[in-house]
Amino acid sequence: KPHNLVIAPNITFAATLNSIVYLNAEPLLLDVCPHTWQMDTQLLHDFLTTQTYLNQNTCYLRQTNQRIAALMPVHVLGNMVNMQHLLQLSEQFHIPIVEDSTEALGSYYMGKHAGTLGQTGCFSFNGNKIMTTGGGGMLVTHNEQLARRAKHLSTQAKTNPVEYMHDEVGYNYRMVNLLAAMGVAQLEQMPQFLSRKAQIAHHYTTAFAAHLPFIQPQLTTTHTQPNHWLYTVKLPQWRNLLAHLRTQGIETRPLWTPMNQLPMYAQCRYITHHHVAAQLFEHCLSLPCSTNLTPQEQEVVIEAIHHFYTSGNAAMH
């Protein structure tokens, strides 16, 4: 509802927060864990314990009396949030979980697929995801009532299969049949896609550990089986490295700008102790990791990065 608060991480793609604002609700930003780069659930625990109160099984921000309507964890880069802790907080403070699993198709937490642990989960089939339909996505839920309502709204809220009767303002969010067929074919290849992603991530990590140990990959917990969607590392001078790799015909990209550094979200309340999101933004770079990347092409990337840091190029900038 308007002016409700939705807690989301400060490191995410802007679409996460845009979806909140579309409903006239307000994002409440939370910093991320420095190791996994996911929503910091201990920081969330401390915030909810000290700065909120419960009234009739509803959680409110003490300072403004605004209702906290949802927790929106984002499984950043295909890694996963500490869902065990988050589910405990959800139950304790009566705040439902809406999982942004747009990057996490094929990721698992304690044997459960991303997007299936909260009240609802959403996935993206954008062209840069592990499987694609060119665009669009998918919503999943264990709640049949929510599923029926979502389907109803996605078909222009049409109530009669023949006559043009509508009972509320709806949306044209249906996926066209041709793209859905593409998605089914892509899903059949998911095991191979996930296997190749894991191979690429393992090779990068092994190579950097052996020769460039200061390059730090995103860490995962023992509970998490990530899909390795986008191989991203923490390293020095990422802007200079990006420019250097571009001269070699190698495309890389930085991590998302923290949400509180974007003009439309700069005034959002931000829960942080150590500004981890800003530190990650200043030091992280995503490397080529498409399932179409050949082993030979990956070696070219690794060698170019090694050359940058060992030939004096890094020191020259």
Put a short name on every predicted segment:
Residues 18-20, 89, 113, 178:
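Hydrophobic/aromatic ligand-binding patch that stacks against planar heteroaromatic rings
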